[in-house]
Amino acid sequence: MKCLSYQKVRLLLRHCAHRSFLRPGKELHAVLTTSGLKKAPRSYLSNALFQFYASSGEMVTAQKLFDEIPLSEKDNVDWTTLLSSFSRYGLLVNSMKLFVEMRRKRVEIDDVSVVCLFGVCAKLEDLGFAQQGHGVAVKMGVLTSVKVCNALMDMYGKCGLVSEVKRIFEELEEKSVVSWTVVLDTVVKWEGLERGREVFHEMPERNAVAWTVMVAGYLGAGFTREVLELLAEMVFRCGHGLNFVTLCSMLSACAQSGNLVVGRWVHVYALKKEMMMGEEASYDDVMVGTALVDMYAKCGNIDSSMNVFRLMRKRNVVTWNALFSGLAMHGKGRMVIDMFPQMIREVKPDDLTFTAVLSACSHSGIVDEGWRCFHSLRFYGLEPKVDHYACMVDLLGRAGLIEEAEILMREMPVPPNEVVLGSLLGSCSVHGKVEIAERIKRELIQMSPGNTEYQILMSNMYVAEGRSDIADGLRGSLRKRGIRKIPGLSSIYVNDSVHRFSSGDRSHPRTKEIYLKLNEVIERIRSAGYVPDVSGLVSHSEGDLEEKEQALCCHSEKLAVCFGLLETKPSTPLLVFKNLRICRDCHSAMKIVSKVYDREIIIRDRNRFHQFKGGSCSCSDYW
């Protein structure tokens, strides 16, 4: 080490940061510390070490080293490096606090710092801080930079201020392709696909990001055929290759929309480009493979997700987290527990790992393993976070251990948030714990007075308890305040197109055929033992049992499945996506439909996947 100059050490650290060589960089740090070489000149090597750790995502160490550097020896690069690294690794609040500190200590704010600040505000969708940042940029005189203006437009676009985006765009003397793309993304998000298409055709030049925005827009609208045509034009006619950022963005859009057809197209493209499977898989390859694992799991094909995972030559903790989250959604908690030892031999688990494992235990009712996992957090150098407590409360609640769940919730180091309280309220509903539910409901109403879901859940509990008068009063109060429940919406992919249904929907072009099929389905499953579960429906003076049953029959997922039965060949699996939790009646009905029609029916609701096959569900009625 003595033969190494300071310049060479600095270059080595930069090389380790650039190539993500974390272990060699740490070893070099250790040698510097023990050899005494780190002591001088301080501003030369300390800054290099800090920048290495910040670039590598080791933010705790980076912050410590940054704090050790005297203020007089910190330059703009140090401040902006820490600022951008906080943003890159999701520590957005830290970024904001650091920017405030920079202003307080009169650190020179340049265009790089402002662009980073705007990016943080865009991610947080914090309009107040965004406008403050805009004011700072005006004072600093950096709005002459196209790059800064593009970041400013993107920030306002993420916050929904479309008119402000358009105003800034019109005032730009130089409109780059990035400027156009930011406007396109904003318009597609807030004004719709039709208006976005107009902007897309107006663009004098289109980059890969602009094409990806349009592809994601069509994916969200369910236009599979148009997506494939766009991809063909983008790749084969315009020559825009899909890099790992574009591929991951498209796979994320496929996962959110449930579009398996386009997801498979992207998978084939990645294979042809020899991504993911090479012996020397890069970080980019790992991210594409991880996005595929996530996409297949969220599109209901957990077997393909597992296959991609097994074929990856290199995996990181994000890959494992994606797989565990997917397995949790599919109710395969035991598999997650069995694979955990293999994971810790490959990578170090993080907070998200334990959230996924605890979620898997919750969806599978594995209480003892869940407790062991929760208590092992500190063994891996982690402190239990709110998300971990939320999973444990959910696990105990689902298992019927309501009192134990409430005790754990009250012992949390921070007050329970809406997720934790909402989870416990749901468990109270399932297990009929009205007294505890009433306490929880009062806390939830204080947090979110406009949320109808909790009050609807309470009214259902009162009905089940035979207290319909209280339920009627609760719902009547909501109606007087003009508060409506969130409507249930279901979508199904048939013949490369998405078809959406709401409860009692009659807007579909084939409504008459769908309702004829619905009548046939109800008649056949009644003969097979189906009895409508009306226990959660509030009685009204003008309603009777027949009307209640009719309302249940027209739930959105039943309409979607009936359309699927009409439009697909026998034995074709049906995949339905619902925005809310599937109700008890639809769950019971789908089990019988799967047996009577010999169909596999997969429904992804707000919480998890339900795979109905041969008269049973993959959740084992534990959901």
From Swiss-Prot:
Family (UniProt): Belongs to the PPR family. PCMP-H subfamily.
Keywords tagged on the record: Mitochondrion, Repeat, Transit peptide
Superkingdom of this protein's organism: Eukaryota
Name recorded for this polypeptide: Pentatricopeptide repeat-containing protein At5g15340, mitochondrial
PANTHER family noted in UniProt: PENTATRICOPEPTIDE REPEAT-CONTAINING PROTEIN
Region (Type DYW motif): 527-623
InterPro entries per UniProt: DYW_dom, E_motif, Eplus_motif, Pentatricopeptide_rpt, PPR_At4g14850-like_plant, TPR-like_helical_dom_sf
Species in which this protein is naturally found: Arabidopsis thaliana
Encoding gene, per UniProt annotation: PCMP-H91
Transit peptide (first-last residue): 1-16
Region described as Type E(+) motif: spans on this chain: 496-526
Entry-linked Pfam families: DYW_deaminase, E_motif, Eplus_motif, PPR, PPR_2
GO molecular function, one term: RNA binding
